[in-house]
């Protein structure tokens, strides 16, 4: 293959441009962009809880009294295979986050969610008896420590402009 590529280069037939030239191997012709069809791919999506290492600090950040239940920040991802490599959970500094309590799968749970995604997330995970405890900007949670969901190690909460409320929970799992 390399000798064949060398001959193409020597003949001056290899050009560097801004767009690829798509070819049909069946017909031996170039294809226009309008002739290219992409296969739809459905990716799995999951919600994963990152429990607060210091749950009291989580309640202090929201200036509210602690309540019963596991407390943490859930993330939503369409790339679950990257979770083992997770190094942080990102929030947006200026988004409003709510601290809510309720029951998930029969367990009292306290979650941090972007306000704009509250209804969508609680519906998706089947949270019952949702009570809003407090709200705060994401910036108050910077540097908080969360437990990695699979490994015996902590990950920090960081701030990122890439975090949006288009889908998910308002928290983005971050892996290299």
What spans do the regions from the language model cover?
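NTP-handling and nucleic-acid-processing catalytic cores
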Residues: 1-176
């Amino acid at each position: 293959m390399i000798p064949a590529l060398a001959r193409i280069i020597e003949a001056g037939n290899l050009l560097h441009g801004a767009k690829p030239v798509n070819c049909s191997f069946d017909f031996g012709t170039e294809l226009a962009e309008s002739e290219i069809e992409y296969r739809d791919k459905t990716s799995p999506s999951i919600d994963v809880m990152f429990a607060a290492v210091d749950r009291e600090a989580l309640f202090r950040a929201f200036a509210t009294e602690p309540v019963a239940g596991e407390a943490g920040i859930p993330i939503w991802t369409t790339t679950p295979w990257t979770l083992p490599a997770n190094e942080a959970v990102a929030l947006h500094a200026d988004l409003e986050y709510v601290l809510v309590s309720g029951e998930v799968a029969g367990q009292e749970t306290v979650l941090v969610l972007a306000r704009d995604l509250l209804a969508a997330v609680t519906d998706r995970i089947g949270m019952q008896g949702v009570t809003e405890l407090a709200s705060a900007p994401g910036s108050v949670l910077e540097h908080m420590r969360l437990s990695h969901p699979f490994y015996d190690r902590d990950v920090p909460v960081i701030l990122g402009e890439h975090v949006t409320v288009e889908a998910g929970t308002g928290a983005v799992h971050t892996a290299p």
